[in-house]
Amino acid sequence: MKRIYVVGTADTKGEELVYLASCVEAAGGRPVLVDVGTRRPTVLVDISAETVAAVHPGGAAAVLSGNDRGTAIAAMGEAFARFLPARDDVAGVVGMGGGGGTSIITAGMRRLPLGLPKVMVSTLASGDVGPYVDVSDIIMMPSVTDMAGLNRVSRVILKNAAEAITAMANRPAEETASKPAIGLTMFGVTTPCVTAIVERLKADHDCLVFHATGTGGRAMEKLADSGLLSGVLDITTTEVCDLVFGGVLPATEDRFGAIARTDLPYVGSVGALDMVNFWAPETVPERYSGRLLYRHNPNVTLMRTTPEECAAIGRWIGAKLNLCSGPLRFLIPERGVSALDIEGGAFFDPAADAALFEALETTVNRSDRRRIERLPLHINDPQFAEAAVAAYRDIANP
C-alpha cells in the first residue's frame, strides 16, 4: 500500500516531525517517519538515518561519522537523493526543516517523478527557492516561525501541510492521456512559429510548451528523461547563447543530453540564437561595452550575437547533436532566427546568421537519421511551422 513519507531531521526537529506525522494520519493518510538527521534522534522513527545513509556510495560512515556539519548535510542529501526514488510505496512526501533539512529533503524530492505530490515546509520558503526546487514541482510552504518547537503558528502550518499532502496523495488516479505528449521550446520572439506548430499538432498531440529561460529547457529535458514525452520540437535553442556567453537565462552543459539519452524523435532549430539575455541595461557586463543592445522591457536587455559568437554557438550545438542517435532533423530558417532578426529589425545581421548556419553544417555529422535542412524562410513564417510539423511527422511515424 502506498504511504506518505514524512521526512525531517529527528535529531533537531523530532517534536515537530512526530506532530506532522500525526496530522497526516488524522487527515486519512498512512505516514512513515523518515529521519535524515546526522546525529542521534530524539524520537522514534520508522526509517532511520542509518538506513538512508547506507545507500551513500561511501556507506553510512561517509554520512554519519564526520564532525563537519556542512559535509554531513551534503552527504545525507546525496544519500536521500538515492534512497527516495528507489522506494516503491511513495504516495507523497512532506518534509519540514530549516536550511540543512531543506537542502537534504529537496535533494530527494527533485529525483521523484513530476506529479507525485511533494510539499516542503521550510524556513527558507519565502526567499529564493530556485536551488531547492529547480525544475521539479515541489510545493514550498513557508514555516513563518522558526522550527524550534511547536507553537500556535507552527501547529497550524504543519497541519495545513499534512492536509495538503494527504489530499493530493489520496486523489483519484487520472486516466492515462490518449494523445502522445511532445515538448516544444518558445521565446517571445519565436511565439508565432511555435503557436502555429501547436495549432497544427494539437488535434493528435498533447503539446507542452516550455519558455526557453534556462529552467524551461531543463524542465523539458527532465520530462524527456522521465519517459513522459514522445518527441521534441526544440525550436528555440537560445539558452545556449546565455550558457556560452554569460547571460542570465542559461542552459546547463547537459542541454540536449536527454535527447541523446532517450533517442526521442527530435526536430530542432536556431530560434533566438541572435541574442544573449541580461537584466536591466546597467547589469550588462563591462566586457560587452559598445555592443548592440535591445531593451526588451525595463528589466530585460538583449545583446545581439556577433558572427564570431554565432560560429561558436553553432559548433557547440553541432557537437551536441552528434551525440544523438535517434531520428533528428535540424531546420535552418535562412531569412532570420527571431522576430528581431528580420529585414529592418533591430538584430538583422545576415553575416552573423551565416556564421551560425555554416558552423552548424560544418560540425554536424550528417546521416540518414541526422539531417540538417536549410529553408528560404524566416522562422516565424507560417511555411516554416509547416515544415517543422512535416519533419516531425516524418520521423515520429516512419
UniProtKB/Swiss-Prot annotation:
<protein>
    <recommendedName>
        <fullName>UPF0261 protein RA0729</fullName>
    </recommendedName>
</protein>
<dbReference type="Pfam" id="PF23189">
    <property type="entry name" value="UPF0261_C"/>
</dbReference>
<dbReference type="InterPro" id="IPR008322">
    <property type="entry name" value="UPF0261"/>
</dbReference>
<comment type="similarity">
    <text>Belongs to the UPF0261 family.</text>
</comment>
<keyword id="KW-0614">Plasmid</keyword>
<dbReference type="InterPro" id="IPR056778">
    <property type="entry name" value="UPF0261_C"/>
</dbReference>
<dbReference type="Pfam" id="PF06792">
    <property type="entry name" value="UPF0261"/>
</dbReference>
<dbReference type="InterPro" id="IPR044122">
    <property type="entry name" value="UPF0261_N"/>
</dbReference>
<dbReference type="InterPro" id="IPR051353">
    <property type="entry name" value="Tobamovirus_resist_UPF0261"/>
</dbReference>
